[in-house]
Every structure is written in C-alpha cells, then in structure tokens.
Design a protein with these regions (language model features):
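Flavin-dependent oxidoreductase catalytic cores
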Residues: 1-395
C-alpha cells in the first residue's frame, strides 16, 4: 500500500501519510463551547493511531446558542484550544487543522433563517467573524484552517443555486461565491501565504434546485484559481428535504435523502461519494490547477483507500466514522494488521446521537464509553436490524 503511506507535501505542510481525520462533531465540548479533557483525549487517540492530519470538528465562529459545539468567537476559548493543539503536536509528525463554521437561526417551532433574510451589514459581520476566528486559530496553534461551506452551513447556502438574493451576494455563480472569496482574501492577507487555508464544499447538494457536480466543479475551479491550498469534498445535508423533527427533538438537516447521502449507510456501496472528488479533481486538473483534493464517504478499509489514490480520484483520504470507531485504523493498516481493524459498520448511530446533541460515540464501543477503548480489537460482531435496532452479539 505504497501510496497511502507515502509522505505528501503541499503549501509548505508535510504530511507523513495521506490519511486525514476529517471533521466529526463530538459534542464533547462544554455547553458553552470550551475544550474538555474527554475531547482532548479523543483527538490524542487519533493522533497516536497514525493519522497524518487531523481537522477538528466544526468550531463555531459566533456566540449563537448550539449546545456542546466547540467555540472560537472570543479569546477566552484560545487556552483550551491551545491545550488541544499542543497535545496533538506532542505526537511526532501529526498536523492539526480547524474547521470554522457558521450557521443561521433555526427554531424548534420550524422557523429557519435563510441567506435571503440577511442584511448587507449582517453579511459583513459574518466575514469579520470568520476573520477573527482565523486569527484566534493561529494563536491557538493550528496548522491549517478550513471553512465549512458544505451541507446546511451558512456558506454552503450562499453557494447554492437556491440562493435567490438580488444583490452582489446572490444569483450568478460569481455573486454566490463572493462571501467565501471575501473571507478567504481577508484571511490570506492577515495570515500570509505560508498558512494553509482550505474549503470544504459539496460535490452535489442532492436536492432539487441545488448545486450538482457540474456546478460544483465550477466552484472548485474558481477556488483553485484564487489559490486556496486544498479542497475537501462532501455532499448533501440540506434543509430542503429534511423531515420535520419529532416532538421534543431538535430539527436536523440530515434526515432527508440528501442527509442520508452525506453520511452513507450500510446499504450504500463502499466509496459511495468518491465519484464527486474524482469529478472535481479531474476538472481542476484539466483547468491547470494542482490543488489537492480530499475525498471521504464510506471508505471502510485500507485497500479501497489505496485504490482511490492509485486511480487518481483524490490526493488525500478523509476518514471520519472509521477513525471514530477505531482510532488505531491507520497504525494497524501500516503494520499489516488489517484484520485487527474494528471496521465501521455504517449503522450511523453516531450520526443519530449527534443530531440530538448527545455525545457522538460508536455502538461498537463498550457501553457508556466516551472514547474508544485501548487496546481495541474486534471481539464482537454487530447485527443491524432494518428497523434501526442495534444489538451486539458475542462470537
């Protein structure tokens, strides 16, 4: 598996292999958004498990309430985040990035703010919030910054063809891209060319009237032309096809078809979303750009990851749920112990509890565990009933 474990260098950042821990919200922060020991422990395990680059979960750039999400809207959050980056950097050769996110207002009663509702003053504040968060990220010791412009997040809603604003922030592709470009430009000016800046976008919104792969390749080419350092590809996760929440539960953008495709399930084919990174990578290469592309979406085992790289469908392999399930996935693969990998079964228990703002855990861990056990070997199998019931069975 030569390519998977080859070093990879771009924009002055050297990775010891091509495996990236992509953002999965843990809900291990305090209710006010501060780093906890359990959260640090989760990322320490992933770092020690061999991933070259950890991009931590969506860190919110505004003070708007959202329980147990990490925050960075004020300097008071820097010390905790510094503790996290120092812990990861203690593991030789591991880089740590931060994903910055912004969301619009939504209520339990069904109200959902849209980008069309925002004033120009509010848009300028969103740009400023992202800039200040980026400055704090550098102070906290992160090696890279990623803007969350996928799924249901604010920047994704601006990029979508469903953005019907009548001013310079809506309508045409250039206008829909404007807020992302302005955030990138002011941040690049503030942090310099040496700091790694990337964007995570949808390859396909998977809803009527949203962006398709055709539109996303054009977005990717514009971002590559602007010299972003990397692109990370996701899909779906839109409000437009989300189901109404059950009584007493918070609304979620991941309950409709687009949400199910954002987190491919057990019945989806392995590598279900890789065609999106493949299409985008081919398009940006054809346009003359060499920007690295991260793929993700149901890549359970090393052999598929290696195949994706060898076939040129991505430059880096993003793992979310597999590293949540087994943080030692990379080390076991590197040492030829693939049979010891505790394989993610894609039951999406983690996604379901995440939607309820509960601690994101794995059904294969011992009961009541906050993080994966260590050492961790596959001692049981897990059966999945189609009704959504999960049951451990000893072998």
């Amino acid at each position: 598996m030569t390519m998977l474990f080859e070093p990879f260098e771009f924009s002055g950042m050297r990775l010891k292999n091509r495996i990236v821990s992509v953002p999965v919200v843990s809900n291990l922060a305090t209710e006010d958004g501060f780093v906890t020991d359990s959260l640090v422990e989760r990322y320490r395990k992933i770092a020690e498990g061999g991933a070259a680059w950890i991009i931590i979960e969506d860190v919110v750039v505004i003070s708007r309430k959202s329980p147990f999400n990490l925050r960075i809207w004020d300097d008071q959050f820097i010390p905790g985040l510094r503790k996290l980056t120092d812990t990861v950097h203690d593991v030789e050769g591991v880089k740590i990035g931060i994903q910055l996110g912004h969301f619009l207002k939504i209520s339990m009663k069904g109200y959902r703010q849209r980008v069309e509702d925002l004033t120009l003053e509010e848009i300028k504040q969103i740009i400023e919030d992202h800039l200040q968060a980026a400055l704090r990220s550098k102070k906290a010791g992160f090696d890279s910054i990623e803007w969350d412009a996928e799924s249901c997040m604010t920047l994704s809603q601006f990029l979508s063809r469903q953005n019907k604003r009548k001013d310079e922030y809506g309508g045409s592709l250039e206008n829909r891209l404007r807020i992302v470009m302005e955030i990138y430009q002011v941040t690049r000016e503030a942090l310099g060319k040496e700091f790694v800046l990337g964007v995570r976008i949808n390859g396909d919104d998977l809803v009527m009237g949203g962006n398709t792969l055709l539109h996303s390749t054009e977005i990717a080419k514009r971002l590559a032309e602007a010299e972003v350092d990397y692109l990370s590809i996701s899909c779906g996760g839109q409000w437009e096809d989300a189901l109404p929440p059950k009584a007493g539960e918070p609304p979620s953008a991941y309950t409709g078809y687009s949400g199910l495709r954002c987190w491919p399930r057990a019945w989806d084919p392995d590598g279900a979303n890789v065609y999106l990174s493949d299409g985008i990578r081919k398009a940006v290469r054809k346009a003359g750009y060499s920007v690295p592309v991260i793929t993700s979406g149901k890549i359970p085992m090393p052999d598929l990851a290696e195949e994706i790289l060898r076939e040129g469908k991505a430059d880096l392999i993003g793992l979310g749920r597999p590293l949540l399930c087994d943080p030692d996935w990379v080390r076991k693969a590197l040492e030829g112990r693939e049979e010891e990998i505790v394989r993610c079964i894609y039951c999406n228990h983690c996604s379901e509890v995440n939607d309820l703002f509960q601690t994101t855990d794995c059904i294969q861990w011992p009961k009541c565990s906050v993080n994966a056990p260590s050492p961790y070997l596959p001692k049981h199998k897990v059966s999945i009933e189609m009704e959504g019931l999960h049951e451990k069975e000893r072998v």
